[in-house]
Design a protein with these regions (language model features):
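Helix-biased detector of long, well-ordered alpha-helical tracts
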Residues: 1-351
Length: 351
């Protein structure tokens, strides 16, 4: 009989890197996917979004007015409370459906779990995730669990959308305003918390942001006819911004002074706190990034910071900006104007 791990225990002690900071670097992932070559290029026409070019989720056209969205996301724990971990992991996985402009139908759990932890811990993770899936309008329909010394949890999510009303990474045009719907800094705050350098209130602020769904923001964008958006997660604001810029063939210019930061995040960044994932993000954007000489180093760190369950980044045509912001305000979705889209070589700038 396996001896159970002493209680109480800390989930974060069982992993070196939690949340979206554990994602494989975008540069290495791109290299791996490039090796697929003709296999990615040979997808059927019904696959609207897949590997070539990549987007936030796979989308398959079923009929003229129905497309099915499929996505998958999981990671090690970044908080110690099991139910909260389940909520955050679920919100993060569900976000890719919303980032495509879809509605959630159902989800399946993906879990890796140490045999020497009490089963009740896994129950709480499942319960947190199930509640969040219900909040998103779907249901948790099953899943698969394996043994693993390092716990991991996430979801495979199936959603639906009208194929002509999808949000995509491409489609941004010069003059569009860049809106962001969640403040930045979850990576540095979680990293700082592991070092005992974050107050309880600041950590609570990060947790509240991470378990907040992007559903209302996506609904507002789709209703306004917005087409260019993504969610900001493990590759950071600049990494995901660069993906949009490349997909659109445009230059994204972010106003560093306008970047919203979660309470405590800038102070930690200024003190040199950074996740391991941030180094991957810096390498990914290095050849396509211009940073203004006057931009504070802490803001550069914040712009590279891997986000877990971050907000939506959208390119809004100027003639729709007022209506979009009104819709977001009615839905009580926080949002910030953080930059603009310009003509020119695809890339990102922090000015």
């Amino acid at each position: 009989m396996t001896a159970l791990r002493p209680s109480p225990f800390r989930l974060t002690d069982l992993t070196d890197c939690g949340g979206c900071a554990a994602k494989l670097g975008a540069d290495l992932l791109a290299e791996a996917l490039a090796g697929l070559g003709a296999e990615a290029a040979g997808a059927p026409d019904a696959l609207i979004a897949g590997l070539d070019p990549p987007d936030d989720a796979a989308v398959y056209r079923v009929s003229d007015d129905l497309a099915i969205i499929g996505t998958l996301d999981f990671f090690p724990p970044l908080v110690d409370d099991p139910r909260t971990f389940g909520e955050i992991a679920a919100a993060n996985a569900l976000s890719d459906v919303f980032a495509m402009g879809g509605r959630v139908l159902f989800a399946l759990s993906i879990a890796a779990f140490p045999e020497d932890l009490p089963a009740g811990v896994l129950t709480e993770i499942f319960a947190g995730a199930s509640a969040k899936v219900r909040e998103a309008g779907g249901t948790l329909g099953g899943g698969h669990t394996i043994r693993d010394p390092e716990p991991k949890y996430g979801l495979a999510v199936i959603g639906a959308a009208h194929p002509d009303r999808l949000l995509r990474k491409g489609g941004a045009e010069p003059g569009d305003v860049l809106l962001l719907t969640k403040a930045l800094g979850t990576g540095v705050l979680v990293s700082g918390a592991r070092q005992g350098r974050v107050s309880a209130s600041d950590l609570d602020g990060a947790i509240d942001a991470m378990r907040r769904l992007n559903r209302a923001a996506a609904d507002a964008f789709v209703s306004a006819g917005i087409r260019a958006a993504t969610d900001v997660t493990g590759f950071g604001l600049l990494g995901h911004g660069l993906e949009m810029a490349r997909a659109s063939g445009r230059r994204f210019v972010f106003d560093a002074a306008s970047l919203p930061a979660l309470p405590g995040a800038l102070e930690l960044a200024a003190a040199g706190i950074e996740t391991g994932g941030a180094a991957h993000n810096r390498r990914f954007v290095a050849g396509s990034l211009d940073v203004g000489a006057a931009v504070a180093p802490a803001l550069v760190t914040l712009a590279h910071d891997p986000q877990t369950s971050g907000g939506l980044l959208a390119a809004i045509p100027s003639d729709r900006l007022a209506s979009v912001e009104s819709a977001l305000a009615r839905a009580r979705v926080a949002h910030w104007r953080i930059g603009r889209v310009e003509a020119g070589e695809a890339g990102v700038a922090l000015a």
